[in-house]
Amino acid sequence: EAVIINPIQKKTAAFAIFVDSTTNARIGKAILDYRNAVEYDGLSAYIIADNWRSPDEIKAVIIRLYKAMPPLEGVVFIGDIPIPMIRDAQHLTSAFKMDQERYNFQRSSIPSDRFYDDFDLKFDFLKQDTTDHLLFYYSLRADCPQKIEREIYSARIFPSVKNDSKYILIEKYLKRVVNQKRETNRLDNVMTFTGHGYHSEALDAWNNNLTALREQFPSLSEPGGRLTNLSHGMSKNMKDIVLGELQKPELDLAIFHAHGDYDTQYLIGYPPAENINDNVDAIKLFVRSKMRDARDRKKSIDEVKSYYQSAYNLPDTWFAGAFDDSISCADSLYSANLDLYSCDVTKLAPQAEVVIFDECFNGCFIKPDYVAGTYIFGNGTTVAGIANTVNVKQDIWSDEFLGLLSY
């Protein structure tokens, strides 16, 4: 049976905290403290706990609260809340295009809480996932608006771990939020990073980025303010530089414009060759990786080798050592130093309270060790991550209205 805790404060707008019954039973005090902090911020806050059986169940409650007084303006989902997996809606994404008939449901569907916060979108229920009981598949109906215009905002507090440690992580996070809401900390320290492989290759495309950020955050130009703008081409050791910046105590906001995967932030790519030997080494590294890839995919290694030899007239010696343990290890370490992985973030204490991941898949919360989650539930001070569950174009206006954070 659902547990509903009504607001204490009468405000002009409301906020709803949805939580599963087990999480509420385990860390109920932390959730109550979080509710009180939200109300201190100026919102009437509900707590609704239940053994939720479907997304439709939750959406019905959301719409009811939206029509009540004071009207609902936003929701947060804590713990094991059903996850809508949307199909037949790829035209609403900027870059996610996948054959729904060729690939399985989980891979070709989009985890999206637009199911909950855009009331005009209509869906037909398809099925519940057989391996992950939190996933529910829906098809977007053709007779509803084919654009996203949300009535409310929404967010998730959802660690990627499956064992009981998730309750500890959620509790620690909620305590962090409560403590930060008691502090006065204006946004006057920002780091931006632009990765390799898209329009950041053209520096003219970022010519006015610093100007825009200083207009959005005037405090960056005041004494004590700081704006650090990093580009992938500045250093071959960019990973160490980014890691160092992320751990500076004064950092308030970090913005990443780069390629990504659910557990990876792609930073610099392979650096350009400076001489002939660099070019040869780069080709050797490339063909060794292709041979290992063929082995891992159970394809013919000889066919792959033959293809690259005939296509690029490469000698046998350039393929040597592909499966040698020491060379494989060296290649792996070299590649690992180019990018930022979830396992790197877990060793850090990221200090930015807000991180924007303008990168593919970083917010895919159905995956283990998804990047945004490692920041949120890590050892630092991050309380908000804005990320994508699927791939996304990097030439969209990802920081529109960002200046609102300065108020």
Region spans (language model):
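Cysteine-dependent hydrolase recognition
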Residues: 1-407
